[in-house]
């Protein structure tokens, strides 16, 4: 193999043949003897079976001898059957053939063997014979319907049979009738069968040919044509497949029982309460536990009373900057600010001494912040945040640079607003406690400072007019769950450096006394006092699990959840919803709360603290926090341990039914995560879509090439931005070798980018300059998830790149077993596909030592005998890599140990040259011959370094071979590597372990029937009945399948279990006139031999054929191929051992003679217990005189089992005088013992002829 250049040697299909018995002079089936006056045998198909040999009237294309019953025998019934089964247009010719008027036997037309034209009325009358005692006259041409048996004559030996010794189905010895003079093999079958649907339909096959051929019969009379046109159209009976019911009820969607949609009723939307009640609910500073209990019990949400205002008034009151949206921080983990007033209020708490010390620095910083604000407004269009304030946006910008728990700068100073701002606190007076904490109102909306978001205390007007005025300026207060306030030492000191969180657990309030690590304060909204929290509750606060209305953590019980994003859940109590103008909104994000889901969280799933002992009351709640319980006095509460806890998982993260975020492209497409498998890729895509949806996109211009570069870098956000800018996802540039962005995404393994590109219209099967598809890129780069995603979306798995490689080649090369399994599971890949070097996937796997891949490929039908361009098989490559384990697997799969490549090297040569000791020992133990020489005259011993381990092994094997060279038992040796010489799909080797007989060479191997004289076969393509299927011809509407009664092949190309093996029907495969693909399932025989066979020398029957693999039942084996000759030519042939009768009716019939031209089937022997059956098949033409004979397995065939079929009794009636059957079966009927027993039985019955039954009136019955 010379370092094994890229090319591998071809091992062709194994051959087998029929062996002659011992003592026989001729070669072939049964070893026919040559002798004077000896009759010759003919292989023939079964006689007189309606489904096999349809009787056609004279005048049709390729007509058999007409066989119609005489007058009075029911011609009308046959005509009626024909009319019922034949389409309109053919009925006239049928009636013209059968006759519409009663006709005597003298006027019946008779077939002319020399012409295709029907005999006219002046033709000689057909001779009739009397059958039985009924005296019914039957034309001689109809004898095949009744069955003819050879006539027994008395002579030497007691039983001399004259005539044809036809190989046919098993039948009882005949007592009368004429006997043919040739020994023909035929298909076995019963006697007369009633006309079947297929036999009557077959009468129409040649009518288009008869219509268009020059030798067509006469035109029907006008009267006959007119009579047929007046008849109603007769429909063919078709078999249909059951269809699923259209009324099948839809499968109900399964949802968790505890998750239910909470929708506001019409009464809630339209209900009216007094303004005092609404204001009291909003500003109540009393005990909230009682209020919560009442709200939870009733389940009602009370809305504020107010008349709906027109849109103009709303715009005037609220302003242009008011907006409700969910901030992208929930996805990208950036710090979010929800209220400007909180930041500025914190700044107000700095002492006056600190302000004086830092005044100069803060003035300089103010000027810098104003410049940044102007630049940001110009760039982003002054887009406001939830409060619409630019000051809030500045604070957010500063906090983004820090960690999620950010401590604001101590240098931030309180700015003077353009108008006076009143501090909000208890009675409007600022104090030092938490209850005296002061906030600035939302200046951007110019809301009044008191009465809107602050509690109703003394000194504040609470009359109706005041409330109505405040309602007009009311805005939705949003949460501040993701904001931190500066350290306030007195709050943490007052709490004893313990967590101040209060949890709502099944209607009970439980406190947490875990130690705090940070002193920065947090709160869910401005209605709740600031508090210090432990790390577990800080994490839950960021997840929006703290209700902004009451400040309690929603831990266990029944709550409402708002889902602005697929993975974000805002929890709050039903009584704490935000209300505005008769509508309810989420207190976290301001989304419509009527679509919120009501969820029930069991105790322990939401981070419920362990119950401990009662502890003193906590001080986080102030009098200025509406909706919170008054905790100024000590209260008995159960507290948990102070150890930090892990942030609890969202119990609804996997149960939320949402399609997620989406974006609409300029071309009308939609970008979303729907259809993307769960995983990091889907999460990244959802995050990018939310960011893109929430942020204002900048007007940027991109070059089409930039999309490829961004995809290659994995920049998902930029890719989405470019697709929204209407960049072409199928743009191909010469600089990237015509690769599309989808190629780059598949190469990188980014399934989320592949998803958005395909949604934007990318071609999943686009090819680059090397004809490589994106799926190939994913396979080559070993990205299984991308490959699985593309296969699910219809990526082509069988396309080939420039060098002929397929996806399976690359998967086998890299050794990814899951990838190989994925590709094979599609059923669309060719496991034996060869690239430009002739290498198959199993060769690549053998070269790269992927034994698991090799085992999988072998189970899927990989052929180990295929060779590359240098005639190397996969065993050569296994020996080149030195893998003894792979070599043993291949040898167990019947790989040829003695295969030679272009240089004459065997696998042993290569293993010895590379000094692979294990491989050399394996090959020697399996019988490798170390004396074989390559083209340079070297043996394996010559290629081995002297005195190496391999050298000693070869020396020892040589001595052992010399010691056993004279043993009596012979071993099989390959005498020909392929008797087909490459004409078949698989090589057929020839072996001999019996004698010194060489490989048979007295014939010419052909793979198709040939002709040595003109046969006038109708090959006109316009005469072919064909289908118009666009699928794989699996439906019942396929015309070719209807001609065969049905399509008899399954998806694996095997005969169905219900196929009649005793009387096989005609099979019409799809032909070149059909509209279906060449790969449709109704093309089996025309695809050639696919099973591995071997021609071997038998002990008693000469050459035989055996299987080199397990063959399932119904598998196509091979076709009986030979020379097409007429019956008259067969009578003058010297050797009749290879004749196969194409039709067992008398008259002008034809045969296949495989004596001088044939294939492997000429060596198949007779078996009384056969394992294969012959079937008539039509493919390239539909001339019924010339069917093709295909052999199918009638049962499962084991590896090494000999193949054989039943030649038929007619064959043995002639040949039994010269030799007997040697099959050795227990059911053998033609052995010497069986013949002796039969002769003894007949001899006992001869002295008593009265004991014999009178069978003269009964037609013969074939068995």
Curated annotation (Swiss-Prot):
GO CC, alphabetical: chromatin; nuclear speck; nucleoplasm; nucleus
Residue span of region Histone H3K9me binding: 870-872
Modified residues (N6,N6,N6-trimethyllysine): 239
Effect of residue 1207 to F: In GM7; defective in methyltransferase activity without affecting DNA methylation
Residues annotated to bind S-adenosyl-L-methionine: 1101-1103, 1138, 1165-1166
Positions of ANK repeats: 702-731, 737-766, 770-799, 803-833, 837-866, 870-899, 903-932
Marked site (Histone H3K9me binding) residue numbers: 1120
Positions of crosslink type Glycyl lysine isopeptide (Lys-Gly) (interchain with G-Cter in SUMO2): 272, 282, 687
Protein name (record): Histone-lysine N-methyltransferase EHMT2
Organism listed in the record: Mus musculus (Mouse)
């Amino acid at each position: 193999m010379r370092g094994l250049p890229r090319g591998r040697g071809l091992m062709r299909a194994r051959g087998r043949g029929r062996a002659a018995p011992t003592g026989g002079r001729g070669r072939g089936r049964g070893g026919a003897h040559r002798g004077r006056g000896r009759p010759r045998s003919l292989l023939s198909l079964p006689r007189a079976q309606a489904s096999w040999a349809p009787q056609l009237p004279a005048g049709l294309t390729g007509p058999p001898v007409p066989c119609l019953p005489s007058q009075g025998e029911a011609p009308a019934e046959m005509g009626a059957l024909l009319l019922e089964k034949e389409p309109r247009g053919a009925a006239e010719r049928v009636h013209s053939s059968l006759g519409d008027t009663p006709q005597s036997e003298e006027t019946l037309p008779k077939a002319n063997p020399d012409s295709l034209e029907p005999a006219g009325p002046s033709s000689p009358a057909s001779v009739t014979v009397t059958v039985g005692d009924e005296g019914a006259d039957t034309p001689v041409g109809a004898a095949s319907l009744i069955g003819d048996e050879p006539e027994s004559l008395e002579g030497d030996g007691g039983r001399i049979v004259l005539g044809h010794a036809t190989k046919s189905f098993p039948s009882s010895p005949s007592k009368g009738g004429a006997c043919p003079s040739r020994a023909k093999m035929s298909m076995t079958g019963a006697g007369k069968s009633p006309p079947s649907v297929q036999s009557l339909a077959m009468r129409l096959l040649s009518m288009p040919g008869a219509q268009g051929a020059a030798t067509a019969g006469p035109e029907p009379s006008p009267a006959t044509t007119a009579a047929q046109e007046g008849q109603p159209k007769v429909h063919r009976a078709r078999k249909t497949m059951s269809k699923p019911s259209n009324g099948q009820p839809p499968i109900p969607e399964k949802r968790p029982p505890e998750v239910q949609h909470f929708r506001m009723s019409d009464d809630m939307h339209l209900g009216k309460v007094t303004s005092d009640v609404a204001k009291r609910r909003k500003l109540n500073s009393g005990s909230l536990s009682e209020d919560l209990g009442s709200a939870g019990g009733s389940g009602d949400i009370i809305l504020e009373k107010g008349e709906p205002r027109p849109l103009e008034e709303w715009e005037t009151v609220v302003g242009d900057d008011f907006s409700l949206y969910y901030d992208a921080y929930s996805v990208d983990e950036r710090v979010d600010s929800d209220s400007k007033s909180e930041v500025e209020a914190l700044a107000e708490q700095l002492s006056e001494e600190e302000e004086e010390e830092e005044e100069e620095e803060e003035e300089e910083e103010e000027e810098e912040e104003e410049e940044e604000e102007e630049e940001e407004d110009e760039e982003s269009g002054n887009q406001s945040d939830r409060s619409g304030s630019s000051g809030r946006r500045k604070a957010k910008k500063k906090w983004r640079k820090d960690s999620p728990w950010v401590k604001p700068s101590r240098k931030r100073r309180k700015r003077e607003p353009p108008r006076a701002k009143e501090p909000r606190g208890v009675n409007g007076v600022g104090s030092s406690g938490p209850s005296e904490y002061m906030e600035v109102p939302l200046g951007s909306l110019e809301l009044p400072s008191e009465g809107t978001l602050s509690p109703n205390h003394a000194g504040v007007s609470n009359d109706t007019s005041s409330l109505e005025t405040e309602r007009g300026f009311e805005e939705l207060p949003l949460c501040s769950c993701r904001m931190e306030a500066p350290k306030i030492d007195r709050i943490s000191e007052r709490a004893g450096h313990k967590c101040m969180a209060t949890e709502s657990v099944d209607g009970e309030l439980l406190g947490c006394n875990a130690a705090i690590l940070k002193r920065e304060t947090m709160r869910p909204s401005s209605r709740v006092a600031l508090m210090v929290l432990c790390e577990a509750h800080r994490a839950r606060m960021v997840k929006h699990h703290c209700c902004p209305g009451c400040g309690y953590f929603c831990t266990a019980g029944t709550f409402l959840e708002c889902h602005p994003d697929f993975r974000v859940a805002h929890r709050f109590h039903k009584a704490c919803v935000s209300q505005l103008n008769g509508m309810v909104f989420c207190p976290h994000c301001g989304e419509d709360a009527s679509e919120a889901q009501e969820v029930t969280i069991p105790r322990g799933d939401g981070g419920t603290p362990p119950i401990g002992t009662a502890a003193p009351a906590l001080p986080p709640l102030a009098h200025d926090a509406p909706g919170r319980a008054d905790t100024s006095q000590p209260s008995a509460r159960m507290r948990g341990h102070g150890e930090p806890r892990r942030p609890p998982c969202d119990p609804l993260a996997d149960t939320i039914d949402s399609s997620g975020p989406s974006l609409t492209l300029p071309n009308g497409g939609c970008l979303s995560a729907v259809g993307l498998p769960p995983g990091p890729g889907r999460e990244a895509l959802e995050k990018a879509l939310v960011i893109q949806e929430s942020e204002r996109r900048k007007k940027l211009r991109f070059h089409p090439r930039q999309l490829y570069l961004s995809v290659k870098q994995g920049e998902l956000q930029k890719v989405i931005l470019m697709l929204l800018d209407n960049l072409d996802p199928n743009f191909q540039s010469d600089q990237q070798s015509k690769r599309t962005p989808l190629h780059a995404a598949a190469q990188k393994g980014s399934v989320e980018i592949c998803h958005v590109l395909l949604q934007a219209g990318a071609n999943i099967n686009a090819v680059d300059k090397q004809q490589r598809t994106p799926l190939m890129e994913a396979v080559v780069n070993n990205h299984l998830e991308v490959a699985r995603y593309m296969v699910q979306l219809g990526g082509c798995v069988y396309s080939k790149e420039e060098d002929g490689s397929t996806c399976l080649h690359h998967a086998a090369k890299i050794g990814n077993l899951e990838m190989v399994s994925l590709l094979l599971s599609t059923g669309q890949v060719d496991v034996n596909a060869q690239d430009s070097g002739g290498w198959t996937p199993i060769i690549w796997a053998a070269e790269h030592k992927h034994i698991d891949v090799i085992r999988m490929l072998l189970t899927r039908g990989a052929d180990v005998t295929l060779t590359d361009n240098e005639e190397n098989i996969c065993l050569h490559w296994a020996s080149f890599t030195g893998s003894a384990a792979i070599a043993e697997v291949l040898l167990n799969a019947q790989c040829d140990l003695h295969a030679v490549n272009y240089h004459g090297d065997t696998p042993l040569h290569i293993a010895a040259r590379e000094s692979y000791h294990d491989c050399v020992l394996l090959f020697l133990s399996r019988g490798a011959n170390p004396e074989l020489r390559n083209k340079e005259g070297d043996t394996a011993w010559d290629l081995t370094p002297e005195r190496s381990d391999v050298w000693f092994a070869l020396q020892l094997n040589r001595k052992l071979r010399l010691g056993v060279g004279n043993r009596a038992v012979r071993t099989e040796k390959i005498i020909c590597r392929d008797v087909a010489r490459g004409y078949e799909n698989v090589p057929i080797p020839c072996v001999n372990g019996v004698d010194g007989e060489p490989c048979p060479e007295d014939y010419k191997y052909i793979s198709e029937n040939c002709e040595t004289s003109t046969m006038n076969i109708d090959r006109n393509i316009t005469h072919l009945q064909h289908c118009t299927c666009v699928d794989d011809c699996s439906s019942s509407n396929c015309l070719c399948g209807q001609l065969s009664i049905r399509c008899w092949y399954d998806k694996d190309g095997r005969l169905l279990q219900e196929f009649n093996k005793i009387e096989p029907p005609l099979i019409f495969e799809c032909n070149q006139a059909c509209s279906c693909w060449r790969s449709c399932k109704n093309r089996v025989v025309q695809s050639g031999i696919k099973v591995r066979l071997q021609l071997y020398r038998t002990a008693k029957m000469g050459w035989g054929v055996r299987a080199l693999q397990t063959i399932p039942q119904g598998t196509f084996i091979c076709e009986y191929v030979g020379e097409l000759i007429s019956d008259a030519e067969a009578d003058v042939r010297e050797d009749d051992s290879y004749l196969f009768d194409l039709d067992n009716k008398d008259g002008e019939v034809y045969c296949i003679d495989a004596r001088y031209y044939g294939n492997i089937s000429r060596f198949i022997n007779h078996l009384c217990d056969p394992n294969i059956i012959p079937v008539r098949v039509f493919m390239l033409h539909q001339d019924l005189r010339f069917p093709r004979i295909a052999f199918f397995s009638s049962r499962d065939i084991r590896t090494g089992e000999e193949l054989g079929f039943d030649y038929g009794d007619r064959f043995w009636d002639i040949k039994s005088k010269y030799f007997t059957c040697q099959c050795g079966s227990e059911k053998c009927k033609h052995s010497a013992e069986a013949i002796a027993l039969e002769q003894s039985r007949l001899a006992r019955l001869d002295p008593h002829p009265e004991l014999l039954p009178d069978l003269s009136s009964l037609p013969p019955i074939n068995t």
